[in-house]
Amino acid sequence: IAWITPNDLSGNENKMFISHGERDITRSGLDNSSAVLMPKHSLLLSTRAPIGYLAISNNEICTNQGFKSIVPNAGYHGYFIYYLLKRNVSAIAQQGVGTTFKEVSKDTLSNFAVPLPSKILANNFAEKVTPLCEKRCVLEEENRELERLRDWLMPMLMNGQARVE
């Protein structure tokens, strides 16, 4: 099961989606911890060390305590919530408290007020951006696959195990 930490999003700033992190958690590890399995399309907002990384899960995932995960419901579409959070991430980060590491608590995030449009307007927005976001998801996954292929092939080319003709 994919285990996502804020560190996994540190190189993900220009990406909207995430499917895997550096590590995984086993079913046993999940069952014997306070971790929760989050559904596909959950929004992941890092709320400590550092505050403000944001992504949408491409599959079921678990996160560490550095995140507040949001599961969109019937009220507002997930893509609308994503862009709403993205627009307000600096203001959310300013709400962080702590001496060693700043953190935004669940209560602080729950009470963070933003003006909301009507659900009709928000749904119209989501209707327009959904095809674009879905295409972006496909392109990001293709880029990740190309990066994996490059990382596998480059050492082989460098040490002579493979040649390009």
Predicted regions mapped to residue ranges:
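DNA target-recognition domains and sequence-specific DNA-contacting regions of bacterial/archaeal
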Residues: I1-L116
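Amphipathic alpha-helical coiled-coil/heptad-repeat segments
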Residues: G75-Y76, F80-Y83, R87-A91, Q95-K102, ...
